[in-house]
A protein has these predicted regions:
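N-terminal, polar/charged subdomain of small-to-medium soluble alpha/beta proteins
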Residues: 1-94
Length: 94
């Protein structure tokens, strides 16, 4: 299924499911960025909260890379910006 058929958020969620997250919250923040340079249409801005045991022993940078490796082909279009908060289950402030 293509990104257009599944939707950008759905595609992101599908790709990130390979990290076996216990929490995966994806927010579309695009409306807050409408009209700014690089995303004149305002689309493609997302915030991600992801909790996975697979992040254990990884630095913050390595966690971000693990996320970005799965969605790199979607950046810069259709994903213009992705704010990432990545935790292990032990770190997650529940």
């Amino acid at each position: 299924m293509s990104v257009a058929q599944r939707g950008v958020a759905g595609t992101l969620e599908d790709r990130l499911s390979t990290l076996a997250p216990t929490v995966l919250e994806l927010a579309d923040d695009s409306a807050e960025h409408a009209g700014h340079a690089g995303a004149a249409g305002g689309g493609g801005h997302f915030s991600l909260l992801i909790v996975s045991e697979q992040f254990s022993g990884l630095t913050r940078l390595a966690r971000h890379r693990a996320v970005l490796d799965r969605v790199a082909d979607l950046i810069p279009h259709p994903v213009h910006a992705l704010a990432i908060r990545a935790y292990t289950p032990d770190e997650f402030p529940s």
